[in-house]
Amino acid sequence: MTLKIDIKGRGKYKPASDYSIDDVKNVLMEKIFEESSRIINSDDDLEIIEKVDFRTDKINVLSLFSGCGGLDLGFELAGLAAVIGEQAAMEAFKDKDRFNELRNKSIFHTIYTNDLFKEANQTYKTNFPGHVIQHEKDIRQVKYFPKCNLILGGFPCPGFSEAGPRLIDDDRNFLYLHFIRSLIQAQPEIFVAENVKGMMTLGKGEVLNQIIEDFASAGYRVQFKLLNARDYGVPQLRERVIIEGVRKDISFNYKYPSPTHGEETGLKPFKTLRDSIGDLVTDPGPYFTGSYSSIYMSRNRKKSWDEQSFTIQASGRQAPLHPGGLSMKKIGKDKWVFPDGEENHRRLSVKEIARVQTFPDWFQFSQGTNSQTSINNRLDKQYKQIGNAVPVLLAKAVASPIANWAINYLESSPNNKIKNRERKLSIRTFLRIKTS
């Protein structure tokens, strides 16, 4: 069943809201089988994965759609805290040299990353010294994945985003199938995937149902939960779906982290913009400049010092406003203005949004190597990396239960034996298994 229609200005396919549940299911299966026909045409990957630095005393991590490494850094920090203690790990995290001295003690050991974003890969290489194999290749063309204990990834979600077109027909929405293909090949004990809140309602919820079913079909007990980053010490309103799976033969019941910050008794106060960037008023570093679009001005994009930031977007132009100066003023339906003039306001700087995403100050973001492009274009590369990242402290919270389990798991399995795995299993084989 094909659901293509001609509506000027609305693209090639029906918006998700126009589909019935049966329509959604039909389109999903159609797109899944389209994805199964992707050609994987190279054996070069074998040479790459043979170089991975697999450790028998660590939880070896494979990171897909790795970006600049926010999710990976949070896991590494949680793995270090599980070994040397929370306070010692967090103190070390503030200083690059001290953290680099200790980071090899982390229970998590990243051995392989995959991403196509060149500048993000440069950032990753700068901030993750060691023996990580970086595979800058379209995941649909990666034939072999290395053995590992844990797979992480925030698979692309352009059609899931509440700010996006919300089409269930975007091919990039089905790259999660290649995440599943990596699970089938590598058979890690655990996986963690992150995505935007919008995936919960896309296609009347059927898209998420299908994704969970597909992950489970790979041999995992799967669960998901919507978490808000501000509940874990992140000065930002950022809701994300965290999908977690444990291989069915592993006796570990993952429990999502309880909030550490909030207004309830016993919790730490929410972190605010003042806590995060209040000391950068006189030295914020470079920031994106330019006029504000009508869409931008149709929303109040300014928070006060004592609030949490809006969600950081993957765009310099869409960066939230700095909290300094007067608040925006509403003058009509969906219309806001700067009462004291546009010239008295600016967007959050690269350094400020990195702080809001809880990256340490020593973490460096690449602008690329093309010095001929405009300053805004170079800065936008950094905004995109940071906005796409999982906040480090949210990642740490998600990782902590796994880190604590991992220490006992490795003690009981000192040689970290991994079952023999068939590395030639393709997405076509997965689909035959899933639909049989």
Curated annotation (Swiss-Prot):
The keyword DNA-binding is annotated on this UniProt entry: yes
Keyword Cell membrane: no
GO biological process: DNA restriction-modification system; methylation; negative regulation of gene expression via chromosomal CpG island methylation
Highest taxon of source: Bacteria
Keywords: DNA-binding, Methyltransferase, Restriction system, S-adenosyl-L-methionine, Transferase
SUPFAM superfamilies in alphabetical order: S-adenosyl-L-methionine-dependent methyltransferases
List of catalytic residues: C157
Gene3D superfamilies assigned to the protein according to its UniProt record, in alphabetical order: DNA Methylase, subunit A, domain 2, Vaccinia Virus protein VP39
Domain SAM-dependent MTase C5-type: residue ranges: 59-409
Record Pfam families: DNA_methylase (PF00145)
GO MF assignments: DNA (cytosine-5-)-methyltransferase activity; DNA binding
EC number of the protein: 2.1.1.37
Catalytic reaction annotation: a 2'-deoxycytidine in DNA + S-adenosyl-L-methionine = a 5-methyl-2'-deoxycytidine in DNA + S-adenosyl-L-homocysteine + H(+)
Subunit composition and interactions: Monomer.
NCBIfam families linked to this entry: dcm (TIGR00675)
Protein family membership: Belongs to the class I-like SAM-binding methyltransferase superfamily. C5-methyltransferase family.
Name of the protein: Type II methyltransferase M.BsuRI
Gene of this entry: hsdRM
